[in-house]
Amino acid sequence: MYVAGRMLLAFVIALVSLNAMSLQHDDQSANDTEIRIGNLMPYTGPLAEFSAIGKAESAYFDMINDRGGINGRKLRFISHDDNSDPTVALDLTRGLVERDNVLLMFGSFGTPGNLAVRSFLNERKIPQLFVASGNEEFGDPKAVPWTMGWQPSFRAQGRIYANYIQAFYPQRKIVVLWQNDQFGRELFKGINEGLGNLTQMILVDIAFEISDAYLETHVSILKRSGAEIFVFAGVPTTASQVIRLTADLQWHPVFILGDAAASIGTTLSPAGLENATGVISASFLKDPGDPAWKDDPAMKEWLFFMDKYYPKGDKASSAALYGYAAAETLVQVLKQCGDDLSRENVMRQAAALKDYEPSVVLPGIKVNTDPTNFRPIKQMRLVQFDGRTWQPIGDVLETAFSDAPHK
């Protein structure tokens, strides 16, 4: 009995020691010298044009490390290529959590991949912060308390365009060309919600694939409808083609361009600035290709950053600027954490941003969160391209209150 008792005691001590080792391993995701951050990006595949987001984030963290890190801790950014494949995203996320032991996941791109990993991260109580997607499912603290978006929602953006059309072009006929994924569907849904009982104003809508070979046919069909307003929701490379095709067909509708492609450098210049003159969009970030910001201190800092930390990057890339601003927001959260870098405190601080202004957001745009509000940026500004620069239309819009009155 005595021997058996000693063996049982030894087993219990060993089990407790293993648990302690496991807890110690968890704590190493943020120790006295390092904070590990996980990320997934489409460095290859159909959405690789957005990979500049991850590259800029990595470069931003390099800059922070050169400046001493955060509270004496260096940032270790572990970013993998998921090729926009949700299955790959889940496998890579498991590895980042279980093998690399990241403190949090940050800024991973795209709706499908982030939806694929959301349950896993919430079950493990791993922060999934500032998701690079405007899907509203990433802003529901009751359902997924460890997941938080960052940018305005796609649906809210669609409602903004619908409200603008009703205010300035009442009763005009509309056509919509939207990307056949969650982004395009959500934005199109927002347009319908904003129009309310006036959805009959939409004569034709066409969903297209990212690698669509029939863009010219689509645009020709939309022109023949006789519509006076053309709304496009898609990636920058496709947007450039569509703007040029519209001009080639001698069609001159009011052209509304989704924010994802609202970039002078990556969309409008390739399309031809003369073809893009008059394009309308809604934005929340400064456009790094816009000469209006040439004397802006924050944009001068951006150019310095690009020269030193991301010299191979395109200084006019709105995707890179997005990554820069998102990384800046995460750094603010980690600074607020002080020496308490538990995952629980990371989420508390992410939900305690008060009128925070990343340096490159448009004037009047602020980041606000609280325990019931997991949508950090809820404001946008309508802008119109005059052939050289974006001109603001009206004041800052609160996207949370953008439903249109039904006429």
Model feature map: region roles:
Residues 306-309, 313-321, 331-392:
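Segments of small-molecule ligand-sensing domains
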Residues 1-36, 404-407:
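Short, low-complexity disordered leader/linker segments with a strong preference
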Residues 82, 129, 136-139, 210-211, ...:
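Venus flytrap/periplasmic-binding-protein-like
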